[in-house]
Amino acid sequence: MAGKGQRDHVILGNDQTGERIYLTSKNRRNTPDRLVLKKYSPKLHKVVEFKEVK
């Protein structure tokens, strides 16, 4: 049987509005630090940075 694998599910949150609306995955081995992606915020009506929440 196959092992668990290296990909982990992470939740992306916005500090300005407190939104946690995006779910994505990342490779634990290649990206050990916190993930930061630019995504659309429906509350602000613009693209802002969403950071990984643990």
Swiss-Prot record:
Kindly list the biological process annotations in GO that this record carries: translation
The residues forming the signal peptide are none
Q: Pfam families this protein is in?
A: Ribosomal_L33 (PF00471)
Recall the GO molecular function terms of this protein's record: structural constituent of ribosome
SUPFAM superfamilies, per the entry: Zn-binding ribosomal proteins (SSF57829)
Looking up InterPro entries in the UniProt record yields:
Ribosomal_bL33, Ribosomal_bL33_CS, Ribosomal_bL33_sf, Ribosomal_zn-bd
Assigned GO CC terms: cytoplasm; ribonucleoprotein complex; ribosome
Keyword annotations of the record: Ribonucleoprotein, Ribosomal protein
Q: Which family does it belong to?
A: Belongs to the bacterial ribosomal protein bL33 family.
What's the name of the protein? Large ribosomal subunit protein bL33
Native species: Oenococcus oeni (strain ATCC BAA-331 / PSU-1)
